[in-house]
Structure formats: structure tokens, C-alpha cells
Amino acid sequence: MAKISNIFKEETRKADLHPKRVTHWIHYTKLKDNPAQYRYGKTVQERGELKVEIRRKEEALADLIEADGEVIQDLLVRKIDTDEYEIIAGHHRRNACKILVEERNQENYAMLPCIIRNLSDVRSEFTCYSSNGYAAKTDYEIMCELEGMSHLLRTYPEEFPNLPAG
């Protein structure tokens, strides 16, 4: 049987352990590539070699987004200017939506769901590497990640206070 005293009992709420994530809707043209994004290639030659394969993947992603009717995962960005954001995670999603808007005339994909984080250049680069941690990668991409993360951890240990030294 329900107790009437439970209805009026004041609950003590536990403090939120995690910050609230707020989705901001940002036009795809306001989202700029992160210079640390290595999956498109780092040199002109590498970009040329990867261009066709990346385009195929982004068209397939555009098809999936269209089938879902929305981008189902927020992009992670940081503000770099008054009305400009740098993508930390979500480059392919942005490019897939660009295909939907510019080539398939579907304006409803012009605004992308984004979480805005206040990150230093070092943390932004590190997060760019770590956010690609679970995707299938070539040996080259794995090497870029490991070298980049290792360099950041050695060069800027103060940016990673939660990691044990050594």
C-alpha cells in the first residue's frame, strides 16, 4: 500500500557528476575542418590517393543519414571565431550532410546537432585522435594516431593532469 508520507517527502538530490550536454544546431558552412584530422591524408599526395575512397564512404553515410531522417549523433566542436566552429569529431557527418544539401537539394540537413566544448589546441588535437579510436583504420591511420597522441602526452603533460606520470 502506498504511504502518503512518501508523497510529501523532500528528496535530497545528488549533485550531477557529469556536466549537462546541450545540443546546439549549427549550419554546416560554419563548421571548419580540424587541422589535426589525419584521416583525409596529411600531404597533397595522400589526400589525392584517399579522395575517392573517402568520397565513397561519405556518400554511403549520406544515404544512412537520409534513411534515418536525421544525424543521430552530435558532432563535437569548439568555437574558434564569432560564428565559426572547428570540428573535433564528426568530419564525415558534416561532409555527408554537405552532400545531402548541395548535391541532393535536401536543405533539412543543413543544420547539424553539435556539442560545443571549450578545449585548448592540445586537448582538441588529442580528442580528434581519440574520437577516431574505434573506427576501422589503415596502418597509416593507426601510426598517425599513436605518433600524434604520444607527442602531445610527452610535450604537454600539464594538459593531461588525470594521467599517471611515467
What do these predicted ranges mean?
Residues 1-113:
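Short, charged/polar connector segments at secondary-structure boundaries
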Residues 95-166:
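Amphipathic, charge-rich alpha-helical segments that serve as recognition/docking helices
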